[in-house]
Amino acid sequence: MEKLGLNQIREMYLSFFEKKAHLRLPSFSLVPQNDKSLLLINAGMTPLKPYFTGLKVPPSKRVATCQKCIRTGDIENVGKTSRHGTFFEMLGNFSFGDYFKKEAIPWAWEFITEVLKLPKDRLYVTIYLDDDEAYDIWVKSTDVDPSKIFRLGKEDNFWEHGVGPCGPCSEIYYDRAQEKINSVEEFVEAADNDKIVEFWNLVFTQFDKDENGNYNRLSNPNIDTGMGLERMATIMQGENSIFEVDTINAILKEVCNISGTKYNEHKNNDISIRIITDHIRSITFMISDGILPSNEGRGYVLRRLLRRAAKHGKSLGIDDRFLYKLSNVVIDNSCESYPKLKDRKEYIKKVIRLEEERFDETIDSGMKILNEFIEELENSNSLLLEGEKAFKLYDTYGFPIELTEEILQEKNMGVDLEGFNKKMQNQKEMARSARTETNYMGAEDTVLNKIPLYIDTVFEGYNSLESTSKVKLMIKEGEFVSLLSQGEKGVILVANTPFYAEMGGQVGDKGIIYNENFEGKIIDCKNNVAGKILHFVEVISGSVSLEDTVLLKVDKNRRDDIRRNHTSTHLLGEALRRVLGEHVHQSGSYVDEHRLRFDFNHFESLNDKQLREVEELVNENIRKAKTVNTNLMSLEEAKKSGAVAIFDSKYSDEVRVVSIGDFSRELCGGTHVGNSGEIGLFKIVSEAGIAAGIRRIEAVTGREAVEYLYSKSDMLKEIANKFKCSEKEIVHKLDLQFNELRELRKELEEFKIKLAGSAEESILNGVKIVKGINLFTGILKDVDGNALRELADKIRSKSQNAVVLLGSNAEGKVNLVAMATKDAVEKGVHCGKIIKEVAAVAGGGGGGRPDMAQAGGKFPDKLEEAIGKCSAIMEKIVK
């Protein structure tokens, strides 16, 4: 058996099935398209689900892929075992109603025995208990040893998920131990002990299970297979661990090199090395597919992996940021099969480095807080961290809850996950209450996505804003209907339309639909997952039926404003590339009739000079009134022409290229002006960061830009009137005001310090003795925290064996400070504990060290009661 590299195996598999008339498709993005049920692609067949369910027509009836996948369900085992990982590649060959078992089984056997040349005597096969058809094909169409075919039950060899398509499967195993297996019981035991390892699963989707549990035969059965590439590589390379596979081991060796540690010498170090090795693969591919670290969704998965890897780097003694360097190894080993990695190499590294920097900024303070929590747990003989405290680490310091759990587990402690989840849910509900969520006017997504494939709409809106058409389908309240009447809302599909459906960041058109018996408003236009154009209609008068002839008319003024904004995004994108560099790629956009929003990757905010330069470059190309041309061409031709493609978008073989003179050329399906001069004026209104490495520019054009400038001019006039000066003198007047304000504040601070100082004598004279310790307390008015600390420190410095507790009411807020001398601390005084109980009375919280602590509160009227509690607290804690 020849030792084959992981990249070799991938190519051999795809080439083999290409020769069997399969269309080789590139891996889909890790970000699921039109599937809200998934955060990340987790299986080879997942992106192909619309083809299996009939929602979309497949590009070929036979397809072969190598799909990037991420699973984090077993993340706690990653690093602890030699086979668990979060990132893997899944090889698969698929048939959509074309070939079936009699082809799939012999081809699988041919590939593993004749191409990979696996020894036949080390191969086992399982089939479903009652699948005689599969057994006969294995025996008659291959030379597998019949004694090595085992029949297993539904749990092992029948694929189903609730109701819907399902079927038996056949799995192929490799024998590692070379021990004779004579029965099903021995086979199952060998599999459980990893003596034999499953590497290829052939699923025969031949039934449709109904709600009554009946299995009805499909008229067009499908084939869905999956072979784990990394697992196959361990077999072909004679290894027992995925971390010994050539491309993965290269990463592991670099981790050892960076950390100065050796593998297989120390158990805990090995766990950290394996975690980093695995996680950097997921991190690199996720960022390549446009995912960025955040606190929710797939962005949170990325942040969790990245910060977990960074934390284990610190466990290995790596103090510097290193993950961004480590991504080089992943890219170098995978870029031949995934060229996007090479194209986005610098982008990937910068995103990783930025997140490492952010983690470095928070981990020290976060670890300090966590260690304090751990100390509190140890002092109170408790093993469970409160959910509220875990949430504080997550929300304030960016500690993924899983990282907190992992650190606590090392101390044999845990987290109150129920309490944490409750706090998390409260935060989500607060965010949700700030926005409203609506569906398509009562039309359920499931119905909209079940529109028959034969119903199609021709889009005529590039050349016309009016069309005469026929009604082909209607939906009301989640059901297909034949009539829509006055006052009702619904979705209408027609044979041809001038209405642009929301896509590529451009909002859908609005307008009217009518005939002699009916009038309706089209209030939105969208695509369903299969690209069907959906008109969302409110019926104003009359009624409309299936097959009625109707006229559709787009709101021209609104469309014109949208076109100005859309063409401006193209000018803006090119201007940003010329001013900031070629690394700039669009990562999102929004275009409506009022404004445009443009998201792009860049790693720092734009300064005023850069913004001015970008804005002027756009306006220069507007003034030059450049012709806007659109051309249809092949994707290959478009790339050769230098046309810019949108970050991580998928395109068909024929694409539409929009060119603005010689300045910009971009793939785009949106609507545009015929000449850049039609835009009139472009004005940037804001620039901000929205995620790690992602900036957002908002701008207005045409009439909206003029209105924006008028509003700025009116504001300047109003300010000038208030200052009783000309507009040119405003800055000078403001400088004078600020200088005067600065002096007044300085005088006020000095006065507050004097005020606090005048109270010093009365506080010293009011000393109390509690268990042999001098207790100085005082309440001051209109004194801030700084002045309060200065006074407390001054009193402490003049005393021995003393505790100082001061409170103030400043601007309706409570400030509290506690300080203790060294000899008082030695007797058991802990200012942090004192201040915590005192602050609670005043409706606040806080903490600190044994010798100094501070806190705030919400109830000034409780201040005297709070300060008065100090004596009782000291009675408890002083030895």
Swiss-Prot record:
SMART domains: tRNA_SAD. The keyword ATP-binding applies. One of its GO terms (molecular function) is catalytic activity, acting on a protein. Signal peptide: none annotated. Its cofactor is Zn(2+). Its EC number is 6.1.1.7. It catalyses: tRNA(Ala) + L-alanine + ATP = L-alanyl-tRNA(Ala) + AMP + diphosphate. GO terms for cellular component: cytosol. Keywords: Aminoacyl-tRNA synthetase, ATP-binding, Cytoplasm, Ligase, Metal-binding, Nucleotide-binding, Protein biosynthesis, RNA-binding, tRNA-binding, Zinc. Its main location: cytoplasm. GO terms for biological process: alanyl-tRNA aminoacylation. It comes from the Bacteria. Binds 1 zinc ion per subunit. The keyword RNA-binding applies. SUPFAM superfamilies: Class II aaRS and biotin synthetases, Putative anticodon-binding domain of alanyl-tRNA synthetase (AlaRS), ThrRS/AlaRS common domain, Translation proteins. It is found in: Cytoplasm. Zn(2+) binds at H566, H570, C668, H672. It holds the Pfam family DHHA1. NCBIfam families: alaS. Belongs to the class-II aminoacyl-tRNA synthetase family. Catalyzes the attachment of alanine to tRNA(Ala) in a two-step reaction: alanine is first activated by ATP to form Ala-AMP and then transferred to the acceptor end of tRNA(Ala). Also edits incorrectly charged Ser-tRNA(Ala) and Gly-tRNA(Ala) via its editing domain. Consists of three domains; the N-terminal catalytic domain, the editing domain and the C-terminal C-Ala domain. The editing domain removes incorrectly charged amino acids, while the C-Ala domain, along with tRNA(Ala), serves as a bridge to cooperatively bring together the editing and aminoacylation centers thus stimulating deacylation of misacylated tRNAs. This is Alanine--tRNA ligase. The gene is alaS.
